[in-house]
Amino acid sequence: MAKLQITLTRSVIGRPETQRKTVEALGLKKTNSSVVVEDNPAIRGQINKVKHLVTVEEK
């Protein structure tokens, strides 16, 4: 299965609590932090919810 590298490119300051929790659930803490996760529909849904805050690359 493919892997995705997700990078938090914008801050969560001033964002709704749901978006903050989603970013935290993806494993991102600080701006410019990155995680590599398995590509699946659940992760894709989380990325879609905060797509304006993150960048995604396929690995």
Swiss-Prot record:
Q: In the UniProt record, does the keyword Ribosomal protein occur?
A: yes
| Keyword Transport attributed | no
| A cellular-component GO term for this protein | cytosolic large ribosomal subunit
Judging by the UniProt lineage, the source's domain of life is Bacteria
User: Do you know which CDD domains this protein is assigned to?
Assistant: Ribosomal_L30
How is this protein named in the record? Large ribosomal subunit protein uL30
Q: Name one GO biological process term.
A: translation
The UniProt family comment states: Belongs to the universal ribosomal protein uL30 family.
Which keywords fit this entry according to its UniProt record?
A: Ribonucleoprotein, Ribosomal protein
InterPro entries in the cross-refs: Ribo_uL30_ferredoxin-like_sf, Ribosomal_uL30_bac-type, Ribosomal_uL30_ferredoxin-like
Q: Which gene encodes it?
A: rpmD
GO MF, one example = structural constituent of ribosome
Pfam assignment, any one: Ribosomal_L30
What does the annotation say about its assembly with partners? Answer: Part of the 50S ribosomal subunit.
